[in-house]
Amino acid sequence: VNHCSSQHEWFQKAMADPDGEYGTYFYIKEGKNGQPPTNWRSYFGGSVWEKVPGYENKFYLHSFAKEQPDLNWENEVVREKIYEMICWWMDQGLAGFRIDAIMNIKKDLIWSDLEPDGPDGLADVYKVTGKVKGIGDFLLEMKHRCFEPYDALTVGEAMFVKEEILPQFIGDQGYFSTIFAFEPCHAYRKGKNYMDYGWPQPFDDWKKETFHNQKIIEKAGFEANIIENHDQPRGASLFIPEEDYGFYSLSALAMIMLCQRGLPFLYQGQEIGMSNRRWEYAEFNDLETINQYHIAREAGMSEEQALKIASHHSRDNARTPMQWNHDENAGFSTEKPWMPVNENYKIVNVK
């Protein structure tokens, strides 16, 4: 609920009349002599600002891809429509929600530049999220309006919440039932680019982060433990060296996860040990991966080196078709799937 699609009716109407009612559903700002209003960098690289079609000095905000315009949570009408949508789904019988990218809904309304942190002169947008105050008001309102009346289970994608404010986020009095334990499984991320990441996951760092996380969480509630999700490479490849991949190593990885205190989350394919596949550049679909490949090339890496790094860390690894059996396309479809099937599907599949 941080953003919608650029194909959504609201956004289409906003682009047709940015000064009208639907323009207030988004963050549309005047630029600086045709340049973006701020120097914030999107999560996928490049400016968070995109020009409104037909206007030289109007821009809309997108923390992620330009096809994902951020919704204006400061607009009460927008919040009411979001709550109405959530409650509609709860009325259909849903038990709860995974709430994605939720920490991005509160913006710095001063719209000030940040100290650049890269050669592009931009600064990561998450630094804005980390310094603004008042997100709790939105989260509590959403909880009281949408989740409490249904006794819903909610899992927030809230990264790197400080220990002293954890009780505000999880437990009976928290904004959510629980949040994902990202810190341990992100221990390999030693910088902001793929080429700075470790491979495979450094075990000692993972162990240290896991024990630390478990210790601080127990005072407030419990976390949702993960090894992988749709935004990461396959855990079977990230945590296990390729030469050690097999039944026993996968079983050990599963045991470590399942024996931790908290709520284990299994991502589709994880239960059978689905792993990363080998990629060609033309096969990548993920915008983040494509951008990271080019960042590696611009840093002086060869095509082969950049492809290897991109293949290791690409989110596309977690988005290949589920491997049901050894039939064509792993039994996923008789038609050509939108992403290529992992080459090992004849060995690694549900059947």
Language-model region placement:
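Conserved alpha/beta catalytic core and glycan-binding cleft of carbohydrate-active enzymes
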Residues: 6-39, 139, 143-321, 326-329
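C-terminal catalytic domain of photolyase/cryptochrome flavoproteins
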Residues: 317-319, 323-350
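Hydrophobic residues within beta-strands of alpha/beta enzymes
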Residues: 97-99
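Short glycine/proline-rich turn/loop motifs
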Residues: 59-74, 121-123, 231-240, 341-350
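Short phosphate-binding/catalytic loops that engage adenosine nucleotides
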Residues: 94
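Acidic/aromatic-lined carbohydrate-recognition and catalytic surfaces
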Residues: 1-87, 91, 104-164, 169-171, ...
